[in-house]
Amino acid sequence: MMATGTADSQARFGQSVKGLLTEKVTTCGTDVIALTKQVLKGSRSSELLGQAARNMVLQEDAILHSEDSLRKMAIITTHLQYQQEAIQKNVEQSSDLQDQLNHLLK
């Protein structure tokens, strides 16, 4: 009877160890999955940060180009103002010459 009791005890112990081992393997698998998800999330964050940095460089280039264009437009505006003033003076002189010509022809 003693041998049977020992065999039963060993069988129960074996089942208990199997149960604990299965539980530990399941927990370990769950932890590996969680770790993998975290690594992937970190990898994605790094990818997003890289993309954000590239976008900022593109925006900075666009801003610098816009500033350059605005400076050029300011120069063109100044030149157009000078030309407009010159044209206005010529129109006034033309009007004066027209008056003088009319006066001479009378």
Curated annotation (Swiss-Prot):
Carries keyword NADP?
no
Task: Please give the GO cellular component terms listed in this UniProt entry.
Answer: BORC complex; lysosomal membrane
Location in the cell reads: Lysosome membrane
Highest taxon listed in the record's lineage: Eukaryota
Protein's UniProt keywords contain Transport? no
- Keywords (A to Z) from UniProt: Lysosome, Membrane
Q: Give the main localization category.
A: membrane
A Pfam family reported for this protein in Swiss-Prot or TrEMBL: BORCS7
PANTHER family the record matches:
BLOC-1-RELATED COMPLEX SUBUNIT 7, BLOC-1-RELATED COMPLEX SUBUNIT 7 BORSC7
Q: Which family does it belong to?
A: Belongs to the BORCS7 family.
| Quaternary structure (record) | Component of the BLOC-one-related complex (BORC) which is composed of BLOC1S1, BLOC1S2, BORCS5, BORCS6, BORCS7, BORCS8, KXD1 and SNAPIN.
* Task performed by this protein: As part of the BORC complex may play a role in lysosomes movement and localization at the cell periphery. Associated with the cytosolic face of lysosomes, the BORC complex may recruit ARL8B and couple lysosomes to microtubule plus-end-directed kinesin motor.
What is the name of the protein in this document? BLOC-1-related complex subunit 7
**Gene label:** BORCS7
